[in-house]
A protein has these predicted regions:
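Asp-based, Mg2+/Mn2+-dependent phosphohydrolase catalytic module
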Residues: 1-173
Length: 173
C-alpha cells in the first residue's frame, strides 16, 4: 500500500482491472465516483480474453467501455498499448529499444503498443488475433507464428532476437 490508500468515498482515481467476477453494484459505485470527479484508470483495454477451448470472457476493456458510456468520461489506460506501460517494462528489464521484443496475441494492444515504441514484434496466432484478421490493420508485426511454442525453434528464436530477416514481415508455420 506504499504511496496510495484505498478509500470508499471521494477517491482521486477509480482503477478498473481484470476480474473474474463483477457485480453491477460495483459498476454503479465506480460510475457514481467518476461522475463526482474521480478519474478513470484502466489497467488495459482488451475487449475480451481467450480462456481456452475456443471460448472467451469479457475483458477489462468491455467493462471500461460500459463505464465510459455511462459517465461520458474517457479512461486513461496504463496497460497495452500505452507507451507508459511499454516504457516502464523496457526500463525495468534494463533493455535498449532495439533489444526489446514483444510477443503477443492481440494486434490492437500487444503489437500496436510495442511497434509504436520501436520494439520487435511477434504475433502469435494462438490467441485473439487470427490470420484472417490481419488485413484490417494498417500495420504489421515483424514476425507471425502459429504458437508461442514455435519460439522454442532455435533458428527462429535467433532470427527474432537479431531481427535479421530478408523481409519486414515473416510468416512462419
Amino acid at each position: 500500500n506504499a504511496g496510495y490508500s484505498i478509500v470508499d468515498d471521494h477517491p482521486d482515481y477509480v482503477v478498473i482491472g481484470e476480474g473474474r467476477t463483477i457485480m453491477l453494484e460495483s459498476v454503479d459505485k465506480a460510475m457514481n465516483m467518476i461522475m463526482k470527479g474521480s478519474k478513470l484508470i484502466a489497467t488495459n483495454l482488451d475487449p475480451n480474453c481467450p480462456v481456452g477451448g475456443g471460448k472467451y470472457r469479457a475483458g477489462c476493456g468491455a467493462f471500461v467501455a460500459m463505464i465510459e458510456m455511462a459517465t461520458g468520461k474517457q479512461a486513461f489506460s496504463v496497460g497495452k498499448p500505452s507507451p507508459v506501460m511499454m516504457r516502464m517494462a523496457r526500463k525495468t528489464l534494463q533493455l535498449a529499444t532495439d533489444e526489446t521484443v514483444m510477443v503477443g496475441d492481440t494486434m490492437s494492444t500487444d503489437i500496436l503498443g510495442a511497434g509504436s515504441m520501436g520494439f520487435t514484434t511477434v504475433l502469435t496466432l494462438s490467441g485473439v488475433t487470427k490470420a484472417e484478421d490481419l488485413e484490417q490493420f494498417g500495420y504489421a508485426p515483424d514476425f507471425i507464428i502459429p504458437s508461442i511454442r514455435d519460439l522454442l525453434n532455435e533458428d527462429l528464436f535467433e532470427r527474432v532476437i537479431s531481427k535479421h530477416a530478408e523481409d519486414q514481415l515473416i510468416e512462419l508455420g
